[in-house]
Amino acid sequence: MQRYRLDAGGLSLTLIMRNGGDTPMPFGFGIHPYFTARRVALHARRLWPPMSAACPRAARSRMCVSCASLTEGCDTYLSQWEGRATLHWDDGRELALRADPAFAHLVVYTAPGADFLCVEPVSNVADAFNLAAAGDARTGMRVLAPGERYSASLRMDFQLGKPGAIRR
């Protein structure tokens, strides 16, 4: 289930997962918004290897991500991010994204030739089920018991004009 709340400052979103079955249910979730912003600033402590062989491998401990530093057509998989990212437009607009700790992972995507980027808070890394089955406990994959429920929220606040004016 998804719950949206729009107010004068921005948008709040809550995702709710419930296991209605009678067996344990592995799951992960996230949101996948597209933005026309040119840059995104965030801090993360882990960069996962790309899924595609066409994408470069890199290792950085703390990073500020911008469209220019991302490889077009590649997903950048991050973990241990601070749950905050700020998107910047060339005209001074900003969007502050804040996510619950349940969204411990983040994907940043740029498409070849596109004028957008995706900043996607997620509960798990790509291929989490296979990685977890191979013994990697850092993937964020969760298992819900029958009848169990899990939820997480995030907030997007938009600011026109003056850079740095967003409450964080």
What do the PLM-derived regions correspond to, one by one?
Residues 158-168:
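Short, Lys/Arg- and Gly-enriched loop/turn segments at beta-strand edges
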Residues 20-22, 38, 159-161:
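Short coil/turn motifs at secondary-structure junctions
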Residues 1-27, 31-33:
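Acidic, contiguous internal or C-terminal segments within carbohydrate-active enzymes
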Residues 90-130:
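Glycine-rich active-site loops that engage anionic ligands at enzyme catalytic sites
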Residues 128-138:
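Short beta-strand and strand-turn-strand segments in soluble, beta-rich domains
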Residues 24-26, 33-102:
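Active-site/ligand-binding surface loops and adjacent short beta/alpha elements
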Residues 1-3, 139-144:
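Beta-strand-rich interaction surfaces with strong enrichment in secreted/lumenal proteins
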Residues 15, 142-160:
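Short Pro-Gly-centered flexible turn/kink motifs
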